[in-house]
Amino acid sequence: MDLPVDEWKSYLLQKWASLPTSVQVTISTAETLRDIFLHSSSLLQPEDELFLKRLSKGYLVGKDSDAPLFYREEGNKKFQEKDYTGAAVLYSKGVSHSRPNTEDMSLCHANRSAALFHLGQYETCLKDINRAQTHGYPERLQPKIMLRKAECLVALGRLQEASQTISDLERNFTATPALADVLPQTLQRNLHRLKMKMQEKDSLTESFPAALAKTLEDAALREENEQLSNASSSIGLCVDPLKGRCLVATKDILPGELLVQEDAFVSVLNPGELPPPHHGLDSKWDTRVTNGDLYCHRCLKHTLATVPCDGCSYAKYCSQECLQQAWELYHRTECPLGGLLLTLGVFCHIALRLTLLVGFEDVRKIITKLCDKISNKDICLPESNNQVKTLNYGLGESEKNGNIVETPIPGCDINGKYENNYNAVFNLLPHTENHSPEHKFLCALCVSALCRQLEAASLQAIPTERIVNSSQLKAAVTPELCPDVTIWGVAMLRHMLQLQCNAQAMTTIQHTGPKGSIVTDSRQVRLATGIFPVISLLNHSCSPNTSVSFISTVATIRASQRIRKGQEILHCYGPHKSRMGVAERQQKLRSQYFFDCACPACQTEAHRMAAGPRWEAFCCNSCGAPMQGDDVLRCGSRSCAESAVSRDHLVSRLQDLQQQVRVAQKLLRDGELERAVQRLSGCQRDAESFLWAEHAVVGEIADGLARACAALGDWQKSATHLQRSLYVVEVRHGPSSVEMGHELFKLAQIFFNGFAVPEALSTIQKAEEVLSLHCGPWDDEIQELQKMKSCLLDLPPTPVGPAL
């Protein structure tokens, strides 16, 4: 996903392996990115480009005139099953393949409006109705869509507009008698019912307003940092001789305090975990749902009513405004390259979009200016010697009175301020000397192939009369003879190498569960990849003192615990002490980020010499004490006479148990609740015989039982099971962790639906306290908790005890 697809990656690595040793040495010992790029790109042959082109065609990103009917029919099947979300997504796929001002476009929009109406998304439904009519919705079908429009307006409390719509509908009947003949009796009855409903209603509460702007305003940084853009005044930028740039607390910081709120300088939506579709006749069009179908490709807002690009079927947006902005900033160039960019991977895509956002001319200027002042090696490897020194871009000479003019910290401007701009992005470390030669070769050839496609597209856009002679044509199409292409290629190669250590995974919480389930499960999914210059300054800890959350393309860093003045602000790069053991964390950090972690969590665990983390521990079958040892495990209780058992035997039992849990979870997803409970109860009994009480699988089983019992309406049993899961989560992740917040949210849902008012209010308060440390007030779960609390507080007092 980040790197190219496996076929292209394997192809390039084989090409590297087949190169003469002298060529490999030349690339391996090249001192600058420019040399790496030029040496590598000279090896890209026409047959390589043809192979890449064939791979790119595996992604069906163009518009297919036969696809709208297919997706409309598939959407209709989902609609009949009352899966309105699934139907809306399939109708959106039909929209993305439709041409403007066609019946296909209008019918897909109209059908999607019906799905949105059943989902209660009335404002969005109205927009789709207007789109359907704009694109030429057939006259014979107008009554149905106009009635739906009136129903939306009534639901939104816009009664005057609803009345006008009904009047227009009735007037059309009078003016066009043929319409009355095709108007079904059910539609006439619905029209009568709607008119009666309007008479009964004086007004309706307005739909939930766009409170997002207000919550963002409420959560804004109270006091801007003069040295760091988008950062609180509670933190400062420093340089450590060993760590390089870092952020430290300039005053005592309380848990939950907002430290950084930064919009991504550039971001690209991850296409999803699914492979490209096969080319069989039965799978020409893909009905699978990915992030690209659910989120705006520019602002990352979740939407079921996507607005597609007019030129391709891949890029989709939440509004016409986002579509227009994306087109003007970068998509006009990316649009014809969609399949190629998906083949080359997200990192290559970001590298291109970054240069497009900045502008090729500005990229050329900054690199040329650097070339004029310092050596190529310093440009390409700014981390090579002195991490503190950097060029002062605002001065016209590199030396003054024999002294090097420098700003104190790389990435800062002439006034010493570090901002969210291209200067800061350019100064993020590419770690060129740490990447393997074959990886640099792979990245360079990806960028080179992309540059050649950009050249070809640019040449097609140049009128032939503008090309005076053959030398101009040669300069336009040959990268080696075109200095601009070399500059662009070097810039994109630098950014591609930077991304391994500086890319930020932009995540969201997705709720899953059986259809119609009141209590849902949640999981964190990677939605996009972005560059955040300020957040990139944070160093790693396996037990960080901050938490990150996202809304749209904005990342928010909050203190997850009390931070003393002078203490470093630390972020987790992924390997967290509650998710993996110290050996695995060290290996991942070393391979991706090129450092050996020496955080307190790693040092503490390294000295313990434990067999493994508690969430992977086994217990004694006789006394329940934890088992100890490596290959052979023995009971940790001295008074227990239980014989030793091999770890392999217990691991095998665990694997069998996990398979049974997966079967039960599928039963739960399919709605076979009683069978799921029976299967999970058996799994629970088996787990208790050999797994430690804090084992992750014990919590997983309890969570599944809680969801099954909730779906059956047995709220008391559901709460009991979830509290057991809650214990496992608390021991593993901590009482103030975001994972604990999600579990408390689920428990609050169960108490709320079981009418256990005191328990619900108490749990809601705990959940809000924990989640507020990690998320802003706009968080979906926090808003839902507030609605539940408001509802419970409005209930009349009752002497009856809790329902649970």
Curated annotation (Swiss-Prot):
In short, the EC number is 2.1.1.-
In this chain, Zn(2+) 1 is annotated as bound at C296, C299, C318, C322
**Residues holding Zn(2+) 2:** C309, C312, H331, C335
Kindly report the protein's main subcellular placement as a broad class: nucleus
Q: Does the keyword Methyltransferase apply?
A: yes
Q: Name one GO cellular component term.
A: nucleus
ZnF MYND-type residues are 296-335
Spell out the protein name for this chain. Answer: Protein-lysine N-methyltransferase SMYD4
Species annotation: Homo sapiens
